[in-house]
Design a protein with these regions (language model features):
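Short, intrinsically disordered low-complexity segments
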Residues: 198-231
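Short secondary-structure junctions
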Residues: 51-53, 186-203
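Inter-lobe coupling/hinge segments of SF2-like helicase ATPases
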Residues: 1-173, 177, 187, 215, ...
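Short, flexible, solvent-exposed loop/turn segments with mixed acidic/basic and small polar residues
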Residues: 42, 158-164, 194-207
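Short amphipathic alpha-helices in soluble, non-transmembrane regions
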Residues: 182-190, 224-237
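Conserved short beta-strand edge segments in small beta-sheet-based binding/regulatory domains
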Residues: 191-197, 231-254
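Short, charged/polar "capping" segments at the starts of alpha-helices
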Residues: 136-139, 179-181, 222-225
Length: 254
């Protein structure tokens, strides 16, 4: 959604017309996250006369390294937070649900890392407020400052689900026949196989004849999995067959 309220599909670039919610029949749309520039503009209107500093790689002036101790509002993208002289008097962490619930394997840990990096910039007596319906497990880890406990729980869950870093996982993308050939070899070698399934759409279109699959191995067999896939891919290249892309331990599985 742009500043004029026009909504465009991120996949096919088509403008969305009169949209209706199938549940409530409503027509209003709201951004899940408005971005640092828009947030800075809205805060400037809400607090006239108060300086607003926006820091981010996409800003015209780029990332602001530090600010002095005079009263001001600072809006920053994750990783671009300026250091404030004496620390910030308050820190608001916005869009907690958007950041901690992304469909990536490491979304929760990345959210905790970014929130922590911002929280440590606060003054000793300052409040840190997390907004936006964050994942409760990640939020509690931040509240209790229990990063080690969070990491232990994550590792236990990953081990139960046979996911990295407790297991090695290879994601295969390519033509159906090529992916199925690699899966057959993986199964013959005793590795776990998931799929194949249709690949995710690109610009609203699913590539015909494409497939995606996962091959999993315990850490003790991780090198064997990588070696097997490397040999098979070199064989396919030598025979000039359609390439299959292999990514080890991807953050996005499907």
């Amino acid at each position: 959604m742009d500043r004029q309220g026009r909504t465009t599909c991120r996949w096919c670039a088509r403008t969305v017309g009169q949209w209706t919610c199938p549940e409530c029949g409503g027509h209003a749309l709201r951004m899940a996250a408005v971005g640092s520039t828009r947030t800075g503009e809205e805060l400037g209107r809400a607090f006239p006369g108060i300086p607003v500093v926006v820091s981010g790689a996409r800003e015209a002036h780029g990332v602001v390294d530090e600010v002095d101790g005079s009263p001001r509002l600072v809006v920053s993208t994750p990783g671009a937070e300026p250091v404030a002289e004496g620390g910030y008097r308050a820190v608001l962490l916005l869009d907690g649900g958007v950041l901690s619930s992304r469909p990536d394997l490491g979304a929760a840990g990345e959210a905790l890392r970014q929130w922590t990096n911002a929280a440590v910039l606060a003054a000793p007596s300052a409040r840190v407020i997390l907004l936006g319906r964050p994942d409760p497990v990640v939020a509690q880890a931040l509240v209790r400052w229990d990063h080690a406990g969070f990491a232990r729980r994550e590792l236990i869950e990953r081990a139960e689900l046979h996911l990295p870093p407790a297991w090695r996982v290879a994601r295969l993308d390519g033509p159906v026949r090529g992916v199925e050939s690699l899966l057959a070899q993986a199964e013959a070698d005793g590795f776990e196989v998931l799929g194949p399934v249709a690949p995710p759409p690109v610009h609203g279109q699913v590539a015909p004849g494409g497939a995606r699959a996962l091959v999993r191995a315990p850490l003790t067999r991780g090198r064997a999995l990588a070696n097997m896939l490397g040999v098979r891919l070199r064989d396919r290249s030598a025979r000039r067959e359609e390439p299959v892309r292999v990514e080890m331990d991807p953050t996005r599985l499907w």
